[in-house]
Amino acid sequence: MKTIVLCVLVLAVGASMALAQPCVDAAKEVAPAMSAEAKADLEKKLDEARRTALTVPNGGDADSTIWYGRRTGYTGRYKDTIAIFTKAIARWPQDARLYRHRGHRYITLRCFDDAIKDLEQAAKLAKGRTDEVEPDGMPNARNIPTGTLQSNIWYHLGLAYYLKGDFKRALNAYKECMKVSKNNDMLAATSHWYYMALRRLEKNKDAERLLEPINGDFEVIENADYLKLLRLYRGEVKGEALMSEIGDKAETLGNASLGYGIGNWYLYNGDRDKAMDVFRKITAGNQWASFGYIAAEAELKR
């Protein structure tokens, strides 16, 4: 009898410890698929960022540490990235950038509650301060950064809520993001997720009004896929036409972000079976860290 009681206690303690385990410790981590050449380039840049961060007087500064963390994330070492930013936050707890970047990588690891906590804190710290352009770690074709600290805080916060299925709070974050989206690329990206949140809440009139600025003269530098989706929502292109671009006949889809937007369009237009098929194809692919993949994964779990 004592043996049985002891076993029950051990199992209970083990279950309690499992429940208390931080999300990041239990999270799966999948490295991005890339060529050997691309991997070597990322590792070289990471090594440079690491050496810079470690050789700055007094153990580094926030700027060099941020680059060290970001470049660690580009290689797929997401847990290491979070550890770098966690250590940095202990040194510079008032730096909104650190919470913004750690929040992003919490999203990558599907730790949405942790991401929300960080991004809410980042928003508080950035409130009332002059916005700043956020340099790109992977520059676009024109080498023109399109995001700012505040737009990226609100964008990722909206995404974290969206991925949890909390579309009302996602909507509030995207409203704030629209206020600080000062170029077409950020407007396209924000409008895409904002529109989808509106449709999921059946606010169809508001969703239609949101698309009004996306006219024929609207151009972007790097967010071409989001612009294609906005034109789909406007009725200017067909879902089947966009699907054919990314291999609708294959077992997987070559573009998770575009695929998710199309799948979601099928979903809120009443074709759930087709939507689920698209989501399954996305998650059968290799774009594990992309927002489209994470969103498709979340839909399949709802």
Identify the meaning behind each predicted range.
Residues 19-67, 74-75:
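N-terminal leader/linker segments that initiate helical-solenoid repeat arrays
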Residues 57-59, 93, 127, 148, ...:
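Short coil turns that delineate tetratricopeptide repeat
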